């Protein structure tokens, strides 16, 4: 598939915005220094001005006024800590055309093909050189359109990023701002002096793979990875949830806990982990509803903490299907205000937050990361030409990282997008649907 860029514009806020440096909290900084990729797809409506660049750029320029940090650049303070320099430098808006059709992307698995729908960012010139938000509208020959989004992770997490994108789409439809962004991250400042009360296993190094005769690598080469997406219907999710009552269990586990636990179990089985192998699950956990007092609606930034149950693979595989969900459930129950405030303090005492940033070394076999977008309004970006037929990650950077996505049609189904070693993917699919 060929994609030809027609025009690239740096879109700036439509009015004067505060010129300031925005302080970042510890949870803004303990994230990978890259642009989180996501892609929306839209079917044609027959409208003559379908995804008109002028309409989109005008609305974008308007949305950047209240969300002015999005138009800024990263910089460092005198201690080397990353801040956002808010001077209205602008966001990159690219318009492109493709000789392909939307259906060429099949089930929209976040493969390398999807990655070309998002502008590539050149990180080689330093952190002040690139836009925090890069956008690409690609028109396909079927009349459909994709919107590719790359959002610098220090600028926003999923909830804040979608608050911005959905405000932009509302403004393109002529609507006004409903919830203003709250631009002050000092609400997540550590206590002075910091008083961590817990050991914070989530920031400790993960278990390493025990070498057995079965998994001894033949060469030093990094194993080939594969990315797939699997859909589970509402009936399948309900069947899975009903399994929480097996073997006399009386605790009520949510559909999410059962699904995430089942993904963890299926991954352990597909990887053929040794019976005594420890495995750590990393669950991205939004602190907005857990902190007390709760953050103002529209708090703009990162409020993602990490829940990390650890279990032995043999237990996950041999115990009832709800066992993995019980490990998640218990770990999530601990994520209250005291724990999250302690995490902010724990991070404050670390000499180098970069050392704690999660990456390939974190999620790889025998461990797993799960990020759920199920409760996020990922399908609300209606720019005046209807809701997207799909929205999901535009790539999965690491083996062992997965996403749970809600249905675009609200039919109760969920999809699991995951990156695993290629030799484990077929087995994962088998175990995922076997319950």
Swiss-Prot record:
The keyword Acyltransferase applies. InterPro entries: CAT-like_dom_sf, Plant_Fungal_Acyltransferase. The active site is at 153 (proton acceptor), 382 (proton acceptor). It catalyses: shikimate + 4-coumaroyl-CoA = trans-4-coumaroylshikimate + CoA. The keyword Acyltransferase applies. Signal peptide: none annotated. One of its GO terms (molecular function) is shikimate O-hydroxycinnamoyltransferase activity. Its EC number is 2.3.1.133. Keywords: Acyltransferase, Transferase. Highly expressed in stem vascular tissues. PANTHER family: SHIKIMATE O-HYDROXYCINNAMOYLTRANSFERASE, TRICHOTHECENE 3-O-ACETYLTRANSFERASE. Acyltransferase involved in the biosynthesis of lignin. The affinity for shikimate as acceptor is 100-fold higher than for quinate. The most efficient donors are caffeoyl-CoA > p-coumaroyl-CoA > feruloyl-CoA >> sinapoyl-CoA. Belongs to the plant acyltransferase family. This is Shikimate O-hydroxycinnamoyltransferase. It comes from Nicotiana tabacum. The lineage of its organism: Eukaryota, Viridiplantae, Streptophyta, Embryophyta, Tracheophyta. The gene is HST.
